[in-house]
Amino acid sequence: GYLHYGMNRIDERVRRILRSDFGYRVGVLASEEIKNTLGTAMPDKAPKDVIMHATGINLAKRMPVNFDVETKPVLDACEDVVGELARLVNTVVDSAPEELSADLTDAGAVLTGGGAAMAELDRRIGQALGIPCRVADAPEGCAIRGLYRIMENPEAYSAMLMDRQSRQVW
């Protein structure tokens, strides 16, 4: 399986909750800021009384307004996606070759991508896998840096590249 749109699904859910439950429309950047400020991958450990000020459109009045966003709806939006992500990562690791599983057990996993910066995501994934887990330095640029390395020396990485015929990584 895969998680379509990755952590951006949380942003979409935040926008949907604010619109349907509270009558506010916010943009993509605002919902991402709300997620980054109030969201966490460990909702049980999150403070419940945090409030963030946001700007959006009051749909009833069709006017721009400042309003407060509470933690709970954001944590709810995070939990569904993070829970699904943890299950998917666990499934991938369970089906990994023995050598990779041994490396993961010894060295742990490294989270990459912009969503890796979510508060406590490394702990949540580490708990789901039962191995150490950390966030890469500058995680949002890892895919581009990796692609650049492959393009510089494709022969060195040919064994790891996906076979177009089989569409299998291993």
State each model region's role:
Residues 77-105, 150-154:
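Phosphate/ATP-binding catalytic cores across multiple sugar-kinase/actin-like superfamilies
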Residues 39, 43, 101-125:
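Glycine-rich phosphate-binding loops at beta-strand->alpha-helix junctions
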Residues 25-29, 139, 163:
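Interdomain boundary/hinge elements
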Residues 1-79:
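Phosphate-binding glycine-rich/basic clefts of nucleotide- and phosphate-handling proteins
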